A protein has these predicted regions:
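Short, Lys/Arg-enriched N-terminal segments with co-localized hydrophobic residues
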Residues: 1-7
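Short alpha-helical segments enriched in small residues
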Residues: 10-173
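Non-catalytic propeptide/linker segments at domain boundaries
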Residues: 177-182
């Protein structure tokens, strides 16, 4: 049903008006108000927009354990390890981020105290359009999540290519995509 909500919130030419389409704020608030969903956000590079939607919608204290942004490459390397071949905006970096953050979350949250929590980690590593507008920008985003507290984690990775010619527009698009992914 989450996929249907995402698809139904896209408007195409010729679409008829449809009532009860959840707003971005409503989508984030719905997650924030679910006492069983709890997780972390790690957004490096150009994107810190996804966590912002959750903070702005209200009720985030029950959902968000931690948000972080390691913009500096040396600092990012200290947390997630060095990238040898694939660079910082890569699926390899995304995988390291998701694994590291889920491991921290699971190790810091006592399951006996939180038996009904479904944990998640959202991560992205993104480069937006450059100042000279020669490099359009792209990124990797993903989520590692549980749909049942007693089950193992599922994982989704998405590669994003930006078509906007403005860094702010790219960041906003990333925020919407990330929220819908979660």
């Amino acid at each position: 049903s989450n996929i249907i909500l995402l698809l139904m919130s896209i408007s195409l030419q010729g679409d008829k008006p449809f009532e009860n389409i959840p707003s971005i704020k409503a989508k984030a608030l719905r997650i924030n108000l679910n006492e069983h969903i709890y997780g972390t956000f790690a957004e490096i590079g150009a994107g810190q927009e996804v966590a912002r939607h959750f903070f702005r919608s209200g009720g985030a204290s029950g959902t968000i354990a931690k948000t972080m942004s390691a913009y500096d490459k040396a600092f990012s390397d200290a947390i997630y390890g060095q990238e040898t071949n694939s660079g910082y905006v890569s699926e390899s970096r995304l995988k390291k981020m998701l694994d590291h953050e889920v491991d921290l979350l699971v190790s810091r949250m006592d399951r006996k105290e939180h038996p009904n929590k479904m944990f998640f980690t959202y991560a992205n590593t993104v480069a937006t359009i450059d100042f000279a507008k020669k490099y359009k920008g792209h990124g990797w985003m993903g989520v590692k999540f549980q749909t049942n507290p007693k089950e193992s984690f599922s994982e989704i990775h998405i590669h994003v290519r930006f078509h906007q010619f403005d860094a702010k527009a790219q960041q906003e698009a990333l925020g919407l995509m990330g929220l819908n992914l979660i």
